[in-house]
């Protein structure tokens, strides 16, 4: 398998849902590029460097076990531009439910119009991770809740440290 795919997102933070999609994608491609979107108008909880570190620590072993190369990059422009820079022929997108499908179909259509050489592949979320969103994880962590069921252990530790009361 020498196909390259790009999986773009904010990953703030990386969740078990993201990891599920990454695991599935690594089974399909020889090289998976995870592209962290950096947008000047947004204030993320974790810096792009921290998010990249968390993704690598969590997902490098998964990619290795699946026989896929994993690369983490940042981008501040269009995902199609990031895909072209990465030499990707596929966009990977995870789907949790019908609402995701509606949005992702629009996005796939626009991406296809801009980069017809890059095909979108939808990967359905495994049952146990469907309700997980990074937004909900951040909210739970900010209120002192236990996020361990929703994120990798290292991410849970970083969230606890970030929201620790002095």
Curated annotation (Swiss-Prot):
Pfam families: CTP_transf_like. ATP binds at residues 10-11, 18, 94-96, 104, 129-135. The keyword DNA-binding does not apply. Keywords: ATP-binding, Coenzyme A biosynthesis, Cytoplasm, Magnesium, Nucleotide-binding, Nucleotidyltransferase, Transferase. Its cofactor is Mg(2+). One of its GO terms (biological process) is coenzyme A biosynthetic process. Its EC number is 2.7.7.3. It catalyses: (R)-4'-phosphopantetheine + ATP + H(+) = 3'-dephospho-CoA + diphosphate. The keyword DNA-binding does not apply. Pathway: Cofactor biosynthesis; coenzyme A biosynthesis; CoA from (R)-pantothenate: step 4/5. Substrate binds at residues 10, 42, 79, 93. One of its GO terms (molecular function) is pantetheine-phosphate adenylyltransferase activity. It is found in: Cytoplasm. The record marks 18 as: Transition state stabilizer. Reversibly transfers an adenylyl group from ATP to 4'-phosphopantetheine, yielding dephospho-CoA (dPCoA) and pyrophosphate. Belongs to the bacterial CoaD family. This is Phosphopantetheine adenylyltransferase. The gene is coaD.
């Amino acid at each position: 398998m020498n196909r390259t795919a790009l999986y773009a997102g904010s990953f703030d933070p990386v969740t078990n849902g993201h990891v599920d999609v990454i695991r599935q994608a690594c089974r399909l491609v020889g090289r998976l590029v995870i592209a962290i979107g950096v947008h000047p108008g947004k204030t993320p909880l974790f810096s792009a460097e921290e998010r990249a570190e968390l993704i690598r620590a969590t997902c490098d072993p998964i990619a290795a076990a699946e026989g896929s190369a994993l690369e983490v990059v940042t981008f501040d422009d269009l995902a199609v531009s990031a895909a072209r820079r990465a030499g990707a022929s596929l966009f990977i997108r995870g789907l949790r439910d019908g609402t995701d499908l509606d949005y992702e179909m629009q996005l796939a259509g626009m991406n296809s119009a801009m980069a017809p050489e890059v095909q979108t592949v939808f990967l359905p979320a495994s049952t146990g991770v469907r309700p997980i969103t990074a937004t909900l994880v951040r909210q739970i962590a900010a209120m002192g809740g236990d996020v361990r069921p929703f994120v990798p252990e290292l991410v849970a530790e970083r969230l606890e440290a970030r929201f620790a009361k002095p």
